[in-house]
Regions:
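Intrinsically disordered, low-complexity regions flanking or connecting the multi-pass transmembrane cores
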Residues: 1-4
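C-terminal transmembrane helix-loop-helix hairpin of multi-pass membrane proteins
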Residues: 7-121, 127-141, 148, 152-244
Length: 244
């Protein structure tokens, strides 16, 4: 039957505004306050899950836009990227549900499209050496399983599962391992996105550990590409979860 309702239902407007707000606030915490991308996004997730659980998912989605590097996207660019991500979120709200990393993929699309429209080049990097890569993969497995446990076993939900693990990693790892702690914190929150998967998609911890291995491997070997784009980490997790 043809749709006779409003062109943009109120529910969708609230979802759009949640994604948009999450992006702007996360970028402000990340760059304006100087908390860094991992802590900023995780903090938005924890606050959203605690204070606004009904809109925690779109707010957390937006927070990934705010993880963008200021070397790639300025505050003005993030406003546009957040709006694009909000529109994509509304359009994609009924597909790929339960797959960890979906939200980051939406955010990444907003950031990459904004960078393309603005003529901004994404950052490049190098593949880390084997000793660092091995620690990254171990971190990825632990973070993915930990987020899954909080999400599914403890019943706290996907947003809190990921955000708690990301916040702990973002605060603890740089202090604990000064030389590569910041990198491991990034891996930690990346893998936590895989842990957002529902039990229907990833039924047990063993398969989540496998997803964590894949996230770690993809993270390591994608290091030279798409740097500075908010949502790249979620895209990494999304592909890994689908592969499992």
């Amino acid at each position: 039957a043809p749709w006779n309702g409003p062109l943009f239902p109120t529910k969708d407007l609230y979802l759009f505004l949640s994604v948009f707000s999450g992006g702007v606030v996360s970028y402000w915490l990340n760059v304006g306050i100087g908390l860094g991308a991992v802590v900023a996004a995780a903090l938005v997730g924890v606050l959203a899950g605690t204070l606004l659980p009904v809109y925690a998912v779109p707010l957390y989605c937006g927070s990934f836009v705010g993880m963008a590097s200021p070397k790639v996207l300025t505050a003005g660019h993030v406003v546009l990227a957040s709006a694009i991500a909000g529109a994509i979120y509304v359009l994609a709200q009924d597909v790929f549900n339960g797959f960890g990393g979906k939200l980051g993929t939406i955010a990444c699309a907003g950031c990459v499209l904004t960078a393309a429209f603005s003529g901004k080049a994404l950052l490049t990097g190098t593949v880390p050496p084997a000793d660092v890569a091995s620690r990254m993969i171990i971190t990825s497995v632990i973070a993915a399983v930990a987020a899954y446990l909080v999400n599914v076993r403890l019943g706290k939900g996907a947003v809190m599962g990921s955000a708690i693990v990301g916040l702990v990693g973002g605060l603890v790892l740089p202090a604990l391992i000064p030389d590569i702690g910041a990198t491991l914190a990034t891996v930690c929150i990346c893998a936590s996105f895989a842990g957002m998967s529902s039990k229907a998609r990833i039924p047990n911890e063993a398969l989540m550990a496998l997803a964590g291995v894949l996230v770690g491997l993809v993270f390591v070997y994608s290091s030279p590409y798409m740097g500075g784009a908010g949502g790249k980490l979620g895209t990494t997790a999304f592909g890994s979860v689908i592969a499992v």
